[in-house]
Amino acid sequence: GREFNQAAIDRILETCFITPIIHNKTLDALWLELDNWQFSAGGQAIKRLRRDYWPEKWRQAGLPQAQQSTFGWTLMPEVRDLRLDESVGGSVVIPMQSGPFTMTANFHTGLDKEGEIKTIVFEGIQCVSSE
């Protein structure tokens, strides 16, 4: 099966998953680039946990490759261009937060990223914990 061991679950519980779906309704290319997204709480930046954060955590937890692959499929791509009517979704991960935070998502537009930057701000996002 694809069950996660307790050590891996414990690592996951230290984090917060934000799972947006991006749908390009414009005629222009829309660029999803997670490095252009910011997270903050109380005026302080929150560092996003990139894909490269996880392999060492999984090694420490003794998580088999099959489960690592399953987890990887759930993550938002780091970079992706979206054309008219294309969508992409997945999880973006930050350290667990006890209070509300803001997510600012910036998207370049145009095939060469030379169009206007579109920005979407979500305020008051809260993590769900197991407690």
Features from the language model and the residues they span:
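Short, solvent-exposed beta-strand/turn "edge" segments of beta-rich domains on protein surfaces
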Residues: 1-17, 26-30, 81-83
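The feature marks short-to-medium sequence segments in extracytoplasmic or secretory-pathway proteins
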Residues: 23-84, 88, 123-130
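Residue-level detector of beta-strand face positions
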Residues: 21, 38, 104-106
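Glycine-rich, aromatic-bearing surface loops/beta-hairpins
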Residues: 109-131
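Short, surface-exposed ligand- or partner-binding patches at beta-edge/loop junctions that are enriched
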Residues: 85-114
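Residue-level detector of short, conserved catalytic/binding motifs and their immediate flanks
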Residues: 14-18, 35, 90
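General structural signal for secondary-structure boundaries
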Residues: 1-4, 49-52, 97
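Short edge beta-strand/loop segments characteristic of extracellular beta-sandwich folds
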Residues: 19-23, 93
